[in-house]
A protein has these predicted regions:
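A short, aliphatic-rich alpha-helical micro-motif
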Residues: 124, 182, 250-251, 271-274
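ADP-ribose/adenylate-binding Rossmann-like module
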Residues: 131, 256-304
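Glycine-rich phosphate/diphosphate-binding loop of Rossmann-like nucleotide-binding domains
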Residues: 74, 81-99, 157, 161, ...
């Protein structure tokens, strides 16, 4: 049984990867009176007088909402909120297993930015943090920005910042392994959506050489028509030599390739034109090039 079928069977068997468990056993009348009425009225009164006490008297301080609209799930695209639920459950399980943070999946059935923002804002008093997940660009940028302005709890778009942090850490190590100079790198990022743009900005802010963004049409250059606001913004600080062409053109002489796009877009022949290339092919669930193919093309370091 391959990994896909094994995972499907596991999900059928479990009927979901997370559950809500009470932290207070209710075995007696006194237990019930303390956890619920009438005793629960007192913490309610305390919070009503002092809002900050909600983080001490409820689970808010350790509870994160993992929220999607189902428009950019893995590499599957716009598959809808219900189909995004397995990923949201999985992320919640990771929060709990790796950080002991409780998390709750929420899938919003709307593609309207105002509706999504308002919905999340209205439920934000139930949580200590908001983790936005798998929301398509460019809508995701505005949603995160507005929620950060409106909410009094942390708001984090994982596909942007989580991915950027991990990629930067891996690239720093790859630079050491390949003995390249960080400030002189030519880095090609394929995929100019939420993840790609966030990675590009982060690497540029860290001082990584010349970052070249590519999308389905090829290299993105300042002044190009048809760019969305996120692409337009990063075009002013990337592609310093104003190169034009397709992905294959961008990879010639490149020190690093970072893929957050679609499967099988890169060949070993393209890798062979790179400069002792670092290849991070991260299209999910199938990468732009398989690791063995990248190595066969002469890649010096590979991540997937």
């Amino acid at each position: 049984m391959d990994i896909n079928q094994a995972s499907l069977q596991m999900h059928y068997d479990l009927h979901g990867k997370i559950e809500v468990i009470s932290r207070k056993k209710i075995e007696t009348r006194e237990d019930l009176s303390l956890a619920y009425t009438p005793g629960v009225a007192e913490p309610c009164r305390v919070i009503a007088k002092d809002y900050e006490q909600s983080f001490k008297l409820t689970r808010r301080s350790n509870l994160v909402a993992v929220i999607t609209d189902g428009t950019a799930v893995l590499g599957l695209g716009d598959i809808g909120p219900a189909a995004g639920m397995p990923v949201m459950e999985g992320k919640c399980a990771l929060f709990k297993e790796f950080a002991d943070v409780d998390a709750f999946p929420l899938c919003i059935d709307s593609k309207d930015t105002d509706t999504i923002v308002q919905t999340i804002y209205l439920i934000s008093k139930s949580f200590g943090g908001i983790n936005l997940e798998d929301i398509a660009a460019p809508r995701c940028f505005e949603i995160e920005r507005r929620l950060k302005e409106m909410c009094d709890i942390p708001v984090f778009h994982d596909d942007q910042h989580g991915t950027a942090i991990v990629v930067a850490a891996a690239l720093l190590n790859a630079v050491k392994v390949t003995k390249k100079e960080m400030g002189k790198l030519k880095i090609v990022i394929n995929g100019a959506g939420a993840a790609g743009i966030a990675i590009g900005k982060h690497l540029i802010n860290m001082g990584f050489g010349n970052v070249i963004m590519c999308d389905i049409n090829g290299i993105i250059c300042e002044g190009d028509e048809g760019l969305n606001p996120g692409q337009e913004e990063i075009s002013h600080i990337s592609n310093l030599n104003h190169e034009h062409g397709k992905l294959a053109d961008a990879l010639k002489g490149a020190d690093a390739f970072i893929g957050v796009s679609r499967p099988n877009l890169v060949t070993k022949e393209m890798v062979s034109t790179m400069n002792n290339g670092i290849v991070f092919a991260m299209a999910n669930p199938t990468p732009e090039i398989m690791p063995d193919e990248a190595l066969a093309g002469g890649a010096a370091a590979v991540g997937s």
